[in-house]
Amino acid sequence: MENILLNKALLILEDGTKFYGNSIGAKGTSIGEVIFNTSITGYQEIITDPSYFNQIVAFTYPHIGNIGIEINNNESSKIQVKAVILYQTHNIISDFRNKLSFSRFLLLNNIIGISGIDTRKLTRLIRKSGTQYGYVSSEGTNINFKEIKSKIKIFLEKKNLDLVKLVTTKRKIIYKKKYIEKNFFYNIVAYDFGIKFSIIKNLINLGCRITLVPATTKSKYVISLNPDGILLSNGPGNPEIYKYAIRNIQCLLETKIPIFGICLGHQLLAIANGAKILKMKFGHHGSNHPVKDLETNKIIITSQNHDFAIDKSTLSKNIIITHISMFDQTLQGIKLINKPVFSFQGHPESSPGPKDALFLFKNFINLVKDYRLNKK
């Protein structure tokens, strides 16, 4: 058991609501969008997911950190969130494989964590008022509240930043299984808008060689790589900001190359086809979201992490809706008519979450197989 010295900490929302707790991570202050996640497990995967970049994540489940941290379960190279808000954490690690506590993990990554917060009250407030920005401090609670509100206001004026450029790879990276023969893999180019490691692992397990490219990579270069398929990854932020990505996708749609979009990639694909995007009141963040597959009429339980949704009323005639949320009827999946192109709003790789949507990766590979066969 680790001995963690608890200092007083504070969360202030932009409407002035204050929550007092104890510091369990790094010392400092930060400002970010406060969202809540309803997952019971998978806290490590959540806070290392680049889709949460620049956000403050509040966990609704009361006990976080019970099994500690296993570094191999990270979804990126580091913690991506601005801060973590929770009710209670545990520094007694119950998994024999894990040697690092949740609190120590936050501290080593210089991330603020606050425990002792009434996360149910916080969640109800966000559900009622909508997502708010907040200020967190682990440097004590004796601060000037007027000054903090002013800082939040200044931050809000700059909130539409290009977050993708801050999380994308800076160079091309190749991922593949060792000892795989050249003619026995599918050549997939993945746009890194903030990709999770689990997406790469799932595609590799299906026989893919992944060429991960920066988010700003020109479509002409991607086509020159002679891909069998193109993946548009998950990532953070408002999709309408990423004009460069939308233009590249529009060019790629002029080819016959199969395209699969996930989360942010799903939204970008829709925008590239003329659709509009809506900012959700408090988003979908959790691993228990029921989604209806309109093609099979079955319900799948999915992992979700998004604050924007496609406006169904703006879809062009070449788009078919394939999935909808059973919580609020928001659009969850689309495919294009007469093109090997489709996308899904949730996370088929889960991590954390159920595996109900893994079949979408196989659907993508089936399109890739057909394309590869016909282009020879």
UniProtKB/Swiss-Prot annotation:
Subunit comment: Composed of two chains; the small (or glutamine) chain promotes the hydrolysis of glutamine to ammonia, which is used by the large (or ammonia) chain to synthesize carbamoyl phosphate. Tetramer of heterodimers (alpha,beta)4.
Segments of this protein annotated with the region CPSase: 1-183
Active site: C263 (nucleophile), H347, E349
Pathway noted in the entry: Amino-acid biosynthesis; L-arginine biosynthesis; carbamoyl phosphate from bicarbonate: step 1/1; Pyrimidine metabolism; UMP biosynthesis via de novo pathway; (S)-dihydroorotate from bicarbonate: step 1/3
Residues in Glutamine amidotransferase type-1 domain copies: 187-374
Entry protein name: Carbamoyl phosphate synthase small chain
Source organism: Wigglesworthia glossinidia brevipalpis
Family per record: Belongs to the CarA family.
GO MF annotation, one: ATP binding
Annotated EC: 6.3.5.5
SUPFAM superfamilies per the UniProt record, alphabetical: Carbamoyl phosphate synthetase, small subunit N-terminal domain, Class I glutamine amidotransferase-like
GO biological process: 'de novo' pyrimidine nucleobase biosynthetic process; 'de novo' UMP biosynthetic process; glutamine metabolic process; L-arginine biosynthetic process
Superkingdom, taxonomy of origin: Bacteria
Pfam families (UniProt xref): CPSase_sm_chain (PF00988), GATase (PF00117)
Chain sites annotated for binding L-glutamine: S51, G235, G237, L264, Q267, N305, F308
Reported function: Small subunit of the glutamine-dependent carbamoyl phosphate synthetase (CPSase). CPSase catalyzes the formation of carbamoyl phosphate from the ammonia moiety of glutamine, carbonate, and phosphate donated by ATP, constituting the first step of 2 biosynthetic pathways, one leading to arginine and/or urea and the other to pyrimidine nucleotides. The small subunit (glutamine amidotransferase) binds and cleaves glutamine to supply the large subunit with the substrate ammonia.
Catalytic activity: hydrogencarbonate + L-glutamine + 2 ATP + H2O = carbamoyl phosphate + L-glutamate + 2 ADP + phosphate + 2 H(+)
HAMAP family named in the record: CPSase_S_chain (MF_01209)
